[in-house]
């Protein structure tokens, strides 16, 4: 009943704001959480064009006043004045004015690039300049209001998180390892592979009293995997061929991306356990999801149509 009452209240609140002319500027996010635990009711965040993240945050916190001897309703918010000033200062720049009407998408170069471009083409976008093989890194797709930026996977997340790109296409492996503040909107279903734990045949990394040593390019993913098992783990970051580490007795096992498993078999390794599935995902900047809601929803709908073509 409390949930129904809360949603009914949100509905009435939205209707009141809509009647006041603010409906198209409001987005209700039932998944919004805050790092502070003193909020007792509705929470809100505010966004402004040109800022990559919220510039205002607050909410209702009745219980906080009671701690100071006043049992009464209360609410409040804080504003990041520096971010507001930076955003307003940039509004007059020509490139910023142009960006207001453009959805900029960061695409991952390399493994996902070919299939992402094929998806854009299937979605009806003119990608002839991208197909021409130039050394350019920023492309404007004709008659679409879409701009494409080509970058490394980890940089896709950086560009989207900081708001210089509105959307991004990146592998789930990068999302899991790097993390960040953004919306993960669509599983595109291509670039499929998996994270897996592998060892030399017969090696037991779960038994015994010794802390397992795992070599990997993905220490955050590895630690999270073993944490779920309530196990301590020592990770060694490897940039090259991770398969070498167990063969050289540097590590007890590896966590790496596996597609067919052929490389593992050829080096005398076997998959002990699958860690997580991986595929290409669409991510969206938190502020852009609000400020460019209609344009971004249009792009996502076109991409989803492209998947079905």
Give each language-model segment a name.
Residues 98-309:
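Domain-level signature for soluble enzymes in the chorismate/prephenate branch of the shikimate pathway
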Residues 1-99:
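Positively charged, Gly/Ser-enriched RNA/tRNA-binding surfaces
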């Amino acid at each position: 009943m409390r949930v129904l009452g809360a949603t009914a209240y949100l509905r009435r609140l939205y209707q009141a704001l809509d009647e006041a002319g603010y409906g198209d500027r409001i987005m209700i996010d039932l998944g919004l959480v805050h790092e502070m635990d003193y909020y007792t009711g509705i929470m809100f965040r505010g966004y402004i064009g040109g800022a990559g993240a919220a510039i205002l945050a607050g909410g209702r916190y009745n219980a906080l006043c009671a701690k100071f001897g006043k049992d009464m309703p209360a609410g409040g918010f804080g504003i990041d004045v520096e971010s507001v000033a930076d955003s307003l200062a940039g509004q007059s720049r020509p490139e910023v004015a142009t960006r207001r009407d453009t959805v900029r998408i960061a695409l991952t170069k390399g493994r996902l690039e070919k299939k992402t471009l094929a998806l854009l083409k299937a979605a009806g976008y003119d990608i002839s300049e991208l197909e021409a093989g130039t050394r350019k890194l920023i492309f404007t797709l004709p008659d679409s209001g879409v701009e494409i930026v080509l970058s490394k996977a980890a940089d896709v997340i950086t560009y989207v998180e900081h708001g210089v790109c509105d959307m991004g296409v990146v592998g789930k492996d990068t999302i899991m390892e790097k993390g960040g503040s953004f919306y993960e909107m669509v599983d595109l279903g291509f670039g499929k592979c998996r994270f897996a734990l592998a060892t030399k045949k017969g090696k037991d990394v779960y038994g015994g009293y010794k802390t397992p040593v795992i070599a990997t390019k993905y220490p955050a993913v590895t630690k999270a995997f073993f944490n779920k098992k309530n196990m301590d783990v020592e990770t060694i970051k490897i940039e090259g061929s991770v398969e070498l580490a167990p063969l050289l007795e540097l590590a007890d096992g590896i966590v790496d991306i596996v597609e067919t498993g052929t490389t593992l078999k050829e080096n005398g390794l076997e998959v002990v356990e699958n860690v997580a599935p991986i595929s290409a995902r669409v991510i969206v900047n938190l502020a852009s999801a609000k400020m460019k809601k209609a344009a971004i929803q249009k792009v996502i709908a076109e991409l989803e149509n492209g998947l079905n073509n």
